[in-house]
Amino acid sequence: PGLGTVGIRNVKLTHAITGRAENIEGNPGNFTVKALKKPRYIDLEKCTSCGSCEEVCPISLPNAFEYGLVKRKAIYKPFPQAIPNAYVIDKEGDGKHRGCIDCMRCVKECKSGAINHDQKPEQLSLHVGAVIIAAGSPPFDPVIKPEFGYKKYKNVLTSVEFERVLSASGPTQGKI
């Protein structure tokens, strides 16, 4: 089941979505995980996910979830059904585009006081029964195969880009 089905507030489920395991010791049923949790710069208890912060953000970057088909702001919700249902601030950018410029427009706009640009990375020590590691892998880069015409022709898409175009929650709301 997805996290939405299980419920993120389940007392036996710990998520470290912005975390990176640095050390895992122990045996099945009894692990100690040392992890570094990157800051979101958003207080998850205060964020109402209203989106007013995103509306005033002056920075636009390619939306990685939509495979660059559309833009997103430096303060954004990773995807519509994100858990936790809260925003995150991208301070780093993507290598080609800069992230947050600390203009503080979002802080002024946020009625719930959820934004904290001074949040620091946090060391976590978790005692868990099981560890799920979701490393992911980068998708194929079709640019290395020029015979496909990717980026040369507007209507040439990868399979995952086409999946996002067809999705009701994608950049075209499923309309082709």
List where the protein language model places each region.
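Central beta-strand plus flanking loop segment that forms part of the substrate or channel wall
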Residues: 154-167
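Non-heme iron-sulfur electron-transfer modules
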Residues: 1-4, 16-46, 58-108, 112-133, ...
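Short, conserved active-site loop motifs that form the nucleotide-linked donor/cofactor pocket
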Residues: 11-14
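N-terminal structural subdomain of ketosynthase/condensing enzymes
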Residues: 169-171
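Short, intrinsically disordered, charge-balanced linker/junction segments flanking boundaries
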Residues: 173-176
